[in-house]
Amino acid sequence: MRIEMDKIYCGDSLQVLQTLPENAVDCCVTSPPYYALRDYGADGQIGREATPEEYVSRITAVFHEVKRVLTPEGTCWLNIADTYCGTGSKADHQDPKYPKGRNGQQVAFNHRAPGCKPKDLIGIPWLVALALRGDGWYLRSSIIWHKTNPMPESTRDRPTRCYEYVFLLTKSKKYYYDWQAVAEPIAPTTAGRLKSGVSKGNKYNVTVPGQNQPQKINRPREKGAYADEMISPVRSRRNVWQINTASVSYTHLTLPTIR
């Protein structure tokens, strides 16, 4: 099957992927259904499995096909969130105002996972990430998607969740990643430190096991050794990304991001 440009392929993800040729896609950005959080009303849907192990197995099967379809230099960006074990029956935790869950979804209030205690955080993102690594993927980065406007939670015995994971996965050791396109400005204090002098007695001018030499910014130098044109104005993007979700007036099971 030849992939057509500017065409949306609808269907079961695993079945559609199996029809696509090898090494045909440069990038995959996806957020599969989270485990035991929503019911989309589809038979055989991912996310309603009886155990976390079954969920991880199905996700791994889908991404095995993604890896086959991905080009050797391609990248895959996987957004996924975690799930808590329930503490009792659904009736015990049902919100009378939203008997079917907010936005109409059937939330697994009472979901329990073998091997986990009630109220345990299951650790779904890392179970998936490690399973994909075991299936041959290169696990290159774990990125924190930080939301400053998270959904409120009524819990009073733990912090409110305000982040999800984004995993960068690759098919090969070497792949396409344009770091300059996503670079961020250096802090003004960094430029100031580079312009200043550093004495040989600087406490940071030491090595530690596994580090051959001190960081560049801490090496002994005369004041003014670094001119403005010698200092890069940008640095590699870090792995905590603050991206808020956008508010919408219509029913939407997953809120879009602002950017």
Give the ranges of each region predicted by the language model.
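Core catalytic lobe of class I
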Residues: 1-253, 259
